[in-house]
Swiss-Prot record:
GO terms for molecular function: 6,7-dimethyl-8-ribityllumazine synthase activity. Pathway: Cofactor biosynthesis; riboflavin biosynthesis; riboflavin from 2-hydroxy-3-oxobutyl phosphate and 5-amino-6-(D-ribitylamino)uracil: step 1/2. It holds the Pfam family DMRL_synthase. The keyword Disulfide bond does not apply. InterPro entries: LS, LS/RS, LS/RS_sf. PANTHER family: 6,7-DIMETHYL-8-RIBITYLLUMAZINE SYNTHASE (PTHR21058:SF0), 6,7-DIMETHYL-8-RIBITYLLUMAZINE SYNTHASE DMRL SYNTHASE LUMAZINE SYNTHASE (PTHR21058). This is 6,7-dimethyl-8-ribityllumazine synthase.
Amino acid sequence: MSGHGAPTTDATTLDASTLRVAVVAASWHTTIMDGLLDGARRALADARAGHVVQVRVPGSFELPVAASRLAGDVDAVVALGVVVRGGTPHFDYVCHAATSGLTEVSVRTGTPVGFGLLTCDTEEQGLDRAGLEGSHEDKGYEAAHAALSTALTLGY
């Protein structure tokens, strides 16, 4: 949901008071992750989410397994992580595995997974999307809004 043409995301229009939500967050790139988590928490509060559990995992590669484990116990999952391109193919492998894994969790379980995994060429790109002061986007908020909105659409 990035860039020109993105839908407006205002979680105050949602009533998630009956939803159980898991937020799964990676630990790398602390400043960016703090912004993503703050954004997700704001969206959950704006939508009055009923029950929220937060889990931290080491990195973005671990997001799918944690999301999979939690998906059976909640109505929506918000997955947050940051991968910044380095000088090796590791970036491509982690991004592909995490993206495919989170998609698989959502399709296999029927539990919406809000996709808040930033795949950035530079740390500055991540900071610009983290919902921090001066950021142009708030991907944590957007990911939480997407998970809640989809869960409500599906009748959770």
